[in-house]
Design a protein with these regions (language model features):
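C-terminal capping/lid region of NAD(P)-dependent oxidoreductase domains
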Residues: 4, 232, 236, 241-243, ...
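Glycine-rich beta-strand-centered segment in the early N-terminal region that forms part
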Residues: 21-36, 45, 49-122
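Short, well-ordered loop/turn sites that connect or cap secondary structure elements
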Residues: 37, 111-112, 168, 261
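Mid-domain Rossmann-like dinucleotide-binding core that forms the NAD(H)/NADP(H) cofactor-binding site
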Residues: 116, 123-124, 146-223, 228
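Glycine-rich cofactor phosphate-binding loops and adjacent beta1-alpha1 units
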Residues: 166-168, 208-209, 213-292
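Conserved acidic E/D residue at the C-terminus of a beta-strand in Rossmann-like folds
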Residues: 201-202, 293, 432-436
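N-terminal Rossmann-like dinucleotide-binding module
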Residues: 381-444
Length: 444
């Protein structure tokens, strides 16, 4: 099958032929129909890969800290090999798609082969023709909802979780700073919740779009029109809640939030902007600063995401899977309109060119979609059942016959520390590598 990958060392993008993932218990194998390119988070990752080593270090201080810790533990040579091995391997892209169930793993009873599902996760909803997706990271698509619209499920869940963190109430007024993809969805979700919205973005085209999609007023962060709109809608008290859906290194969004929020209002960070809080402004108003973690409760919990252990609805009403299903329902019922957010649709074979145009600025888009070949071609994937293996003693071999090895597991440590030593040894031949993901097999 084909998959979009990027070499993080060189920044090179490619569409590779990689092995088809197996359909493991607790999940489904999905053939992609549409996958979504996030022009915010995802494009930032693509741009970072094209930076110099110094630029990469400056953009990811968290990774630099891990490298320094590894140097202290393992020494410089081992750390260098590990880091360069990680950088010089292919990394996947994508995290939001819609597709058709191709195979159903053991323990799955809520979907069947041929059903349309929306899938989430930066390890399971990749820009690839086929993905294995665990139960809690997919949701059935409601009848009548177009696959291109269902592909917004993941980013819709991100916006929805941010709105839930703000706890909006009927009649309140909210400020949304940043009117990119997530900001536009937040505007619509708030409007659907009975909240009047003021949007802020330096791009007048995005401001106009947000007003079409339900915002009461929008404007440039530097303009007096935004403050005037807030004063008019709130009687001069300030907005009840602010949603930070902007990115970048400017501290302006955080400062603007404090200036336009009412006393004891709520500020929710959804994007990845600078957060140097002006202490006096936040203290004097006793503002409640909250963070929104990705798609919702369950995110980053392996027991939930990989093992399929759901949280009881009485204790956790909105998990990431229930957020995903809820967003799809809102789009299907016309409460949220994603069609105006689709700036470009590209064939999957043109993925590299599309990324390059987005990166270079030749293609201006709030979001873009990859369209995959028509459904119906069966995947050449391993059978669900694990075959019985009969172990027999190996016959004696000639002294100069190479030892043929099969290697199970090809993660970062194996590919940087173990496999290089094995493949360089005289008389050793690596015949087979078995891994859980298609891309780790390709890297090996």
């Amino acid at each position: 099958m084909k998959q979009v990958v990027q070499n993080y060392k060189s920044g090179e993008l490619a569409v590779l032929d990689v092995p088809v993932p197996g359909c493991k218990p607790g999940g489904v194998l999905v053939r992609s129909a549409y996958s979504l390119i996030s022009t915010g988070t995802e494009l930032m990752k693509v741009s970072e890969a094209g930076m110099s080593m110094l630029g990469k270090a400056r953009s990811r201080p968290d990774q630099v800290a891990k490298v320094m810790q590894s140097v202290a533990t393992n020494g410089v040579p081992a750390t260098y090999r590990k880091v360069m091995g990680k950088l010089d391997s292919y990394t996947p892209l994508g995290y939001s798609l819609c597709g058709v169930v191709e195979q159903v793993g053991d323990g799955i009873d809520d979907v069947k082969v041929g059903d349309l599902v929306a899938c989430a996760g930066n390890e399971h909803a990749l820009h690839a023709e086929l993905n294995w997706v665990p139960k809690n990271l997919y949701a059935p698509v409601p009848d009548g909802l177009a696959p291109r619209h269902a592909a917004f499920g993941t980013v819709g869940s991100i916006a929805m979780q941010g709105v839930r963190q703000g706890e909006p109430q009927l009649g309140e007024v909210a400020l949304v700073i940043g009117l990119g993809l997530i900001g536009q969805l937040v505007v619509q979700l708030l409007a659907a919740s009975g909240v009047r919205v003021v949007g802020v973005d330096p791009d007048p085209v995005r401001c106009e779009l947000a007003e079409r999609l339900g915002a009461a007023a929008c404007g440039d962060p530097e303009s007096a029109a935004v403050e005037a709109a807030v004063a008019e809608l709130t009687g001069g008290h300030g907005v009840d809640q602010v949603y930070l859906a902007a990115g970048g290194g400017s501290n302006q969004p955080v400062e603007l939030a404090a200036r336009l929020c009412r006393d004891r209002g709520r500020v929710v960070d959804i994007g990845k902007c600078r957060l140097d809080l002006p202490w006096n402004a936040y203290y004097e108003k006793e503002l409640d600063v909250r963070f929104s973690r990705s798609y919702g409760p369950g995110r980053y919990d392996p027991a939930y995401e990989l093992e399929g252990r759901d949280y009881p609805i009485g204790y956790v009403r909105w998990t990431e899977r229930r957020n995903l299903a809820c967003f799809l329902d809102l789009v299907a019922r016309g409460k949220v309109d994603v069609e105006p957010l689709i700036s470009h649709v590209a064939d999957f074979d043109d993925a590299v060119e599309t990324y390059q145009r987005l990166k270079d600025g030749d293609l201006k888009a709030i979001t873009a979609l990859f369209r995959y070949p028509e459904q119906g071609v069966e995947a050449e994937s391993p059978a669900l059942a694990v075959p019985t293996v009969n172990v027999k003693p190996s016959p004696a071999r000639a002294a100069k016959t190479p030892v043929r090895l099969a290697f199970v597991g090809a993660g970062n440590y194996a590919t940087s520390m173990l496999l290089p030593h094995l493949t360089q040894r005289e008389g050793v031949e690596l015949s087979t590598v078995v891994t859980t993901t298609a891309l780790s097999a390709a890297n090996a």
